[in-house]
Design a protein with these regions (language model features):
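P-loop (Walker A) phosphate-binding loop of NTP-binding proteins
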Residues: 10, 22
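Conserved lysine of the Walker
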Residues: 15
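Hydrophobic positions on the alpha1 helix immediately C-terminal to the Walker A/P-loop
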Residues: 18
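ATP-dependent small-molecule kinase phosphotransfer cores
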Residues: 28-86, 90-98, 129, 134-135
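Short, well-ordered beta-strand core segments
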Residues: 29, 108-109, 158-161
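Small-molecule kinase domains that catalyze NTP-dependent phosphoryl transfer to phosphate-bearing small molecules
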Residues: 66, 124-179
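Conserved phosphate-donor/acceptor-positioning beta-strand/loop module used by diverse small-molecule
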Residues: 88-89, 102-127
Length: 180
């Protein structure tokens, strides 16, 4: 039976690194964040943390915190028929419930957990969209308070702690993927 796994965690925890390991093993990636960037382009907004946050929140401001799951549900369904699917940037509890209701036990959540000081340090030095400590803290608060991010993290089926080396983390992610 094919699987759908959403990789969740706070910004800077290592979600993208984990998702890359799924892709290397033939999983189809569906990136919810793509909808944010498409909308930003439509609005003529520069890609930066402030505009990303405003756009994410605007898309959900209609009162539909499950909007990203609804946007991508047809692609998830089609991809699932063909093979395994990994979802990146599923944030909200509403998104989780929509996907869980549709796919049941075929859907799981993998949470990448990293201590906040380690995440903030990594975010300062990452090459793609680095964040200051202030911006990182602001994003944490915004995602927890405004987009229900804690739900999927709290109910995850499996957790991987990413406080150590890249090598150790990748090994644990690979072991998890291979167990599926």
């Amino acid at each position: 039976m094919n699987k759908i796994i959403a990789v969740v965690g706070m910004c800077g925890s290592g979600k993208s690194v984990a998702v890359d390991e799924f892709i290397k093993r033939g999983w189809k990636k569906i990136y919810f964040g793509e909808a944010t960037f498409i909308k930003m382009k439509e609005l003529g907004l520069e890609i930066n943390e402030e505009n990303e946050r405003k756009t994410r929140e605007m898309l959900r401001a209609s009162g539909d915190k499950g909007i990203y799951a609804k946007i991508f549900l047809p692609e998830i369904e089609e991809s699932y028929k063909k093979g395994n699917v990994v979802i990146e940037s599923m944030y909200s509890w509403s998104e989780y419930k929509i996907i869980k209701e549709k796919f049941g036990d075929a859907f799981e959540v993998l949470c990448i957990a990293t201590d906040a000081p380690i995440r903030r340090e990594r975010l300062k030095t990452r090459t793609h969209r680095p964040l200051t400590e202030e911006a990182s803290t602001s994003r944490d608060y915004s995602e927890i308070e405004n987009i229900e991010k804690g739900g999927p993290i709290g109910i995850a089926d499996h957790y991987i702690l990413n406080n150590g080396t890249m090598e150790t983390f990748q090994k644990e992610v690979i072991e998890y993927i291979e167990s599926k």
